[in-house]
């Protein structure tokens, strides 16, 4: 592991690495199984799901970034990066809503759909949202900026009932922009963490990050760790969950190449039961 300790030291993270390459191969291997909706009920549930996803992006991912800008003390580089994050994620959210409208024009998918959420148990993840509102460090490591999604999003983006337009939107817009703008934030995250280490000490800072990460990972932060959403997508869209097998390896890679130290072990309560969760291994300094 390269020594990347200290503010301003370039991180060792590489966008193309064996883990993301493995996930991309999994994505591609599922393409042949994808198909368009066969009838109006399938168009309706696909449209309502995509509408739900778009509204969730706008209300929560974008909303929390706006909250962070207005409530947390941060420098202007952070404000610039978060503004770009807001623009990108808002485009994705609105894009999913418009894709939903094209699939099922009988419904305005920009409007709340509480009946859909109630029917399938897609409740707001209030605990996870609350963590992100505490402070900037919690927002970074509990939320969308820390890119666990490079591995976990293969599930939510792996729906088997879809359309060519949705696939093109996800490939050309969502996946490309997600990787690009998240990766641009990683050097800033590294420097912010090492600023905290210089101010408060390494042990307390690492302990605080470990606490935030563990609490967030057990608050249904992502679809694959949220049983209601995961079960809904497995039942109606046959999404993959094999990608979770690479999660702990990806977590180790992120910590070592972005922060310069290993993660503390964590047990995720809502881990998919079909995939064995690796045994906990103590972090080495």
Across the structure, where does each feature detected by a protein language model lie?
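Non-heme di-metal
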Residues: 2-285
